[in-house]
Regions:
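RNA pseudouridine synthases
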Residues: 1-180, 184-189, 283-296
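Short, surface-exposed secondary-structure edge patches
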Residues: 45-49, 222, 261
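Residue-level recognition of well-ordered beta-strand positions that form the cores
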Residues: 59, 169, 184, 210, ...
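Short flexible coil/turn linkers enriched for glycine and charged/polar residues
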Residues: 81, 135-136, 162, 203, ...
Length: 301
């Protein structure tokens, strides 16, 4: 594909990432690193600054064949058509294969259920996966069946028009009824498995929240993501002094109310259909573990 720069001083990777229905920033950087992008006929670097009229050419390689073991497992499919499906992921299920999880992930289950009917844009380890939620977060996850749907859904994520709403129980009683956390998130400087709020190298991250109900020592809140950084809600809530109940990574180290992992549920997902643009709104009821915690909190009042 050939493009021509229309803005002076823009980074090469940012230029590629802002093209309609195009690549994510990380995918653009990977293409550049692999030598698949040229600027005026010369291999580009991700931090190259463009001049107006620069010719940018890039090639997206064909998806590698998936070499993952299909695994039969129950899948709670709450929406499906020819282009995509939406899964209600249970707590404890890893999304894609990684160390220690070679054949028991959502991707393994999707390959068993759908076979070749998954997009290949995210590579062989994440076929069809448009966005991710943590292992111990339950709720809705969009899966693309073809590359066109994947590209269009990813574009909505990038321009913040895919609405994702989460239910959470946080530690402490929130004084305000609603608020916004606008704080950049980046990799933790000493613990590479964690994220943190940081001005140095952090990426823009915005979380809107509102109180659903207050309890003794805890608050049930609803969060809406404006961006989608790794661990965003968990990091932002801990940053303002109200870590997610059960989150022993960013919050209190000892389990509370029988929860040893976060009480966080992706309850609503709204987007434009990639084929014709009509609105799709999908909802998932609170899972049993979440309702059990609310019952305990009711009895504590």
């Amino acid at each position: 594909m050939t493009l021509f720069a229309d803005t002076a001083g823009e980074r090469l990777d940012a230029f590629l990432a802002r093209q309609p229905g195009s690549l994510s920033r990380s995918a653009a950087q990977k293409l550049i690193e692999e030598g698949m992008v040229t600027r005026n006929g010369v291999p580009g670097k991700k931090n190259d600054r463009l001049n107006v009229g620069d010719r940018v050419e890039y090639t997206i390689p064909e998806a590698k064949p998936v070499d993952i073991v299909p695994t039969e497992m129950p899948l709670d499919i709450v929406y499906e058509d020819d282009d995509l499906l939406v899964i209600n992921k249970p707590k404890g299920l890893v999304v894609h294969p990684a160390a220690g999880h070679a054949d028991d992930t959502l991707v393994n289950g999707l390959l068993y259920a759908l076979g070749d009917d998954l997009s290949g844009i995210n590579g062989e380890l994440r076929p069809g996966i448009v966005h991710r939620i943590d292992k111990d977060t339950s709720g809705l996850l969009a899966v693309a069946k073809n590359d066109y749907a994947h590209t269009m859904l990813a574009s909505q994520l990038k321009d913040h028009t895919m609405a994702r709403t989460y239910e959470a129980i946080v530690c402490g009683v929130m004084k305000e009824d609603c608020g916004t956390v606008d704080a950049p998130i980046g990799r933790h400087p000493t613990d590479r498995k964690k994220m943190c709020v940081t001005q140095r190298g952090g990426r823009n991250a915005v979380t809107h929240w509102e109180v659903v109900r207050r309890y003794k020592g805890y608050t049930h809140i609803r969060c809406k993501l404006e961006t989608g950084r790794t661990h965003q809600i968990r990091v932002h809530m801990a940053y303002i002094g109200h870590p997610i109940l059960g989150d022993t990574v960013y919050g209190r180290k000892k389990p509370e109310l029988g929860q040893s992992s976060q009480c966080l549920h992706a309850g609503a997902l709204c987007f434009r259909h990639p084929r014709d643009g009509h609105p799709v709104m999908v909802f998932a009821e609170l899972p049993q573990y979440f309702r059990d915690v609310l019952d305990k909190l009711e009895k504590m009042k």
